């Protein structure tokens, strides 16, 4: 599980039909063991291996179909987060990393709070409630005035 508080930015080095390779300058990610869960843009991926400064993930067709990973190409930036531990501050909210769908940004109001409006396609919105939490690209966000339309 994760918290939705990003602790590193990754860079897509390559993507093919069933694999993603990511680099990061953050030493926390260097030398991790195979099998470690890592949140990549909010999707829980299992590290296949770490070599030559790259995180390598095997990715299923299901994951590509439901997540932003289908849009990855070389040099795209990704949000990374290591899994929460028993001593991790839960500054965001509990995030499983099991992604159901993607959303589309429909409006951005730039002010002190930068209000972003999203449209969730084909999503059961009854679970999106005012002052509840959602995770977008791995970032824990608070819902304000959800419009169920």
Feature map (PLM): residue ranges:
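Conserved loop->alpha-helix
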Residues: 1-149
């Amino acid at each position: 599980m994760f918290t939705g508080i990003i602790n590193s930015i990754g860079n897509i080095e390559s993507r093919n039909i069933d694999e993603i390779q990511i680099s990061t300058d953050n030493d926390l990610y260097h030398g991790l063991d195979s099998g470690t869960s890592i949140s990549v843009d909010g999707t829980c991926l299992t590290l296949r291996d770490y070599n030559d400064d790259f995180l390598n993930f095997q990715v299923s067709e299901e994951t590509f179909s439901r997540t932003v990973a289908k849009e990855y190409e070389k040099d795209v930036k990704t949000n990374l987060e290591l899994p929460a531990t028993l001593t991790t501050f839960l500054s965001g909210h509990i995030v499983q990393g099991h992604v159901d769908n993607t959303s589309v940004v429909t409006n951005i109001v730039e002010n002190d709070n930068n209000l972003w409006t999203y449209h969730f396609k084909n999503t059961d919105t009854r679970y999106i409630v005012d002052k509840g939490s959602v995770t977008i690209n791995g970032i824990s966000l608070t819902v304000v005035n959800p419009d169920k339309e």
